[in-house]
């Protein structure tokens, strides 16, 4: 499922028929992939919790977001460390051993609903200087809800594509077109700017 529902996108361009639904869906998929690549992250939530490993360079803080990992649901989250560098995260941290950032889920844009992107150690220290990734976090990764600015950016990209679709042939190349559209539309670029991570695709300014 795309971030923007097909019915919502069609309302934006004044369409209510189903004649071009397949093409519209392909375009929305292309816009979504271009947004994900531009931002270096995806804006949906994993169905179930999975474990991920991280290298940590600061004994007090683990920057998950810098490694394209954010947590949209902390229910059942497990933090564990490999303290002896044997490849097994045998030390499970208690809830009081760390806290999460951003505080209260408030992001740099002042909006709530941002996912966890950093862990701050309180009762313990993160192992650093290890040969193996020393931090293991089990959680549901991603965003609990797609941010409204991202939804607006996708709607705007779809509307821009719709205006030009008569001059485009075939259903391929959507992602490349949308990548260029993001670069060329300052309003879209500004909407997505707060959501770019350090893993955003190089060259997608």
Task: List the predicted regions and their residue ranges.
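Divalent metal-cofactor coordination and adjacent catalytic microenvironments
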Residues: 1-205
